[in-house]
A protein has these predicted regions:
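N-terminal cap/lid segment of alpha/beta-hydrolase-fold proteins
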Residues: 1-25
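Alpha/beta-hydrolase active-site loop
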Residues: 79-99
Length: 304
């Protein structure tokens, strides 16, 4: 059973739209999913239903500036004044809501793409609230981040935070589709499932350009989650699972994704591992052979 809810961000009282999928029997645990950039919670319903059929309560919310967590449609891709810090605190607001709604159960946090950065920044501050972490579709650290950040700040200053810059969009993602250009989709790098791509390209809640404010905060979030400073690490044996498609251009290279894994070990999480799925692109939870990924995740979920 999947139900709709709305809660308020503890950061700035923004309405956060949320979905909850519950199992029919006694729940084994809770899984909170944190989605990526330029998408929304409904895209994860099949995965949520798979997990709830296996006995898990699944929760997901729309990030600020995404889906239904906006004041107006003009705010898609805009993170408001709270920015990336509020985005991270929104994850905690959902975690606290789950605590109110359900009995104490093993708690898993799964973040995809931009969400994979957000869940690491969340873990940096609140690792005592989770029992397992999945880092899915992780963007490797981009050494040009600082230049992009300067450009995004200048754009926001001179054109306004709501300005949508094609240049920022191109610099951020312009090369990702080159290996798949012959397939005829501008975002074929996302996954190889043609039905998913058709839905993606027809979905106005996916096919929007991030605002200058959004890019400022996206790049600041990348800096925070990769920085070795400020980690309030209290659970050194927290299982941290990096999972990505081997053909995901966000990886940059295997060496780069291994640096992300090494960083988590460096800050103290000894039980960190990496699984690359051959032939899969960015959205491994939506790939043609996604059941393989779903099964992999399910096998590693903590439960009572």
């Amino acid at each position: 059973m999947t139900t709709h809810h709305t809660i308020r961000s503890s950061y700035d009282n923004l309405g956060l739209a949320m979905l909850i999928s519950e199992p029919s029997g006694t729940p084994k645990g809770i899984v909170q999913i944190v989605h990526g950039m330029c998408e929304h919670k409904e895209r994860y319903i099949p995965f949520m239903e798979y997990l709830s059929d296996a006995g898990y309560i699944c929760i997901i919310h729309d990030h600020r500036g995404h889906g239904e967590s906006v004041i107006s449609e003009e705010d898609l891709g805009y993170m408001y004044k709270g920015g990336w810090q509020a985005l991270v605190e929104d994850i905690h607001s959902v975690r606290l809501e789950a605590e109110k709604m359900f009995p104490p159960l093993p708690y898993t946090l799964i973040g995809h793409s931009m969400g994979s950065m957000a869940v690491r920044s969340y873990t940096k501050r609140y690792d005592d609230t989770i029992d397992t972490l999945f880092v899915c579709g992780c963007p490797s650290y981009n050494n040009a981040r600082w230049a992009g950040s300067i450009l995004a700040h200048l754009t926001a200053f001179f054109r306004g935070g709501h300005y949508r810059s094609r240049l920022l969009q191109k610099l951020s993602f312009g090369t990702y589709n080159r290996p798949f250009a012959k397939e005829g989709y501008p975002n074929a790098w996302v996954c190889s499932d043609q039905d998913i791509l058709e839905q993606y390209h027809k979905d106005p809640l996916c096919m929007f350009t991030f605002t200058a404010n959004g890019f400022v905060n996206l790049l600041a979030l990348m800096k925070d989650c990769y920085s070795p400073k400020g980690w309030k690490m209290s659970r050194k044996h927290l299982p941290v699972h990096f999972i990505s498609g081997a053909d995901d251009p966000c990886l940059i290279s295997v060496a780069d994704i291994n640096k992300a894994v090494a960083r988590m070990r460096q800050v103290g999480y000894a039980d960190t591992d990496l699984k690359l799925f051959p032939g899969m692109r960015h959205e491994i939870l939506n790939e043609t052979n996604r059941k393989e990924v779903w099964d992999y995740v399910l096998e590693r979920l903590p439960h009572d």
